[in-house]
């Protein structure tokens, strides 16, 4: 029970944000920066980098990634099956393209919800980001001229804490 709370029966474990006394809120913790928050200064930017989304499927044409890069894509998002999977033939072609050009490629999931874990080789894992959100994040990172490791770090900010 609590002497100052209208809801007298509650759990006393951590998790509450604070309490009210005389209609004034008192917080237990200072505001925290949200997980995954990255600041991009776009003050002098008029255009974002071109990033294309390729929807993966069985028998995906392996030349799609090469055609996207040839038409000006500076980064690619693979909207993969399950947790970001693409066919082995398309993966081999994308890997060869990455080795030849260094164009960043992000593995995402096309399902409504889910997570793409890190450790998928040459691609950057999108974590919880769907293809549309991953595209915007990659556009921002490329516009700020982030390198591959910086891009990996930006996406890793959305991963759950281990």
Where are these regions (language model features)?
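Accessory alpha-helical/coil subdomains and C-terminal extensions
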Residues: 1-75, 81-83
